[in-house]
UniProtKB/Swiss-Prot annotation:
Transmembrane segments: none annotated. Gene3D superfamilies: 2.30.30.30. It comes from Polaromonas naphthalenivorans (strain CJ2). GO terms for biological process: translation. GO terms for cellular component: ribonucleoprotein complex; ribosome. One of its GO terms (molecular function) is structural constituent of ribosome. One of two assembly initiator proteins, it binds directly to the 5'-end of the 23S rRNA, where it nucleates assembly of the 50S subunit. One of the proteins that surrounds the polypeptide exit tunnel on the outside of the subunit. This is Large ribosomal subunit protein uL24. NCBIfam families: rplX_bact (TIGR01079).
Amino acid sequence: MNKIRKGDEIIVITGRDKGKRGTISLRVDDSYVLVDGINLVKKHTKPNPLKGTTGGIVEKSMPIHQSNVAIFNAASGKADRVGIKLLADGKKTRVFKSSGEEIKAA
């Protein structure tokens, strides 16, 4: 079970974007996540008339390693850790470590 999933609100805990918040839009591989508006880089693109793209400098979000982000706990307003709790019916659920509150599915 992945502790961080698509749709989770996260906060960046290290790097040049430290403190910024966003929502995970895609999980890349097993250890990278793509967050809208975080880790922006400038890509220089060549014009391609076949694809209908113009050349220039484009800002693009790049993947960030999941160890550099933490799930955001809206109740406390801080970053939090994720724990796995086994329910009585045998299902697993994600909970915040600080409060034990269940994380709502996105």
